[in-house]
């Protein structure tokens, strides 16, 4: 299976990439490192990835920033980080990537526990993560080519063992 991992240099990516490389062909992409250097917060960055890689069976996205602070300290620019770099980046990845993903391929996106169980001071993360969860539910109803789409919502990664994260 040929798998494209976006965010392979991040906390989760550094754990799942070696595990997937054992049995699959893995291509990595990221803002600062990877087989392909690309920023998925822009559609041009996403298109650049697919100019360099073809015949993809699965796309795994563990990339995307979001920010939280106390509600009185939040403003449009702070919300915009999660909306642009996490939510819209993953939506655009699906919209563009669907054209390049093989039939019966798979998207795995990432949200986070704050999308379902927010805590005080987490509204920035809650908005982006909750919207990703909703997008995946809606997209699954009509995504073409037999493609599957799912979202994982990890707890704080530092609290999860590597083996539990890989086998989740």
Describe the function of each predicted region.
Residues 4-19:
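N-terminal Rossmann NAD(P)H-binding glycine-rich loop of SDR-like oxidoreductase domains
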Residues 29-44:
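Rossmann-fold cofactor-recognition segment
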Residues 82-83, 89-93, 106-141, 153-158:
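Catalytic loop of short-chain dehydrogenase/reductase
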Residues 147, 151-168:
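C-terminal helical subdomain
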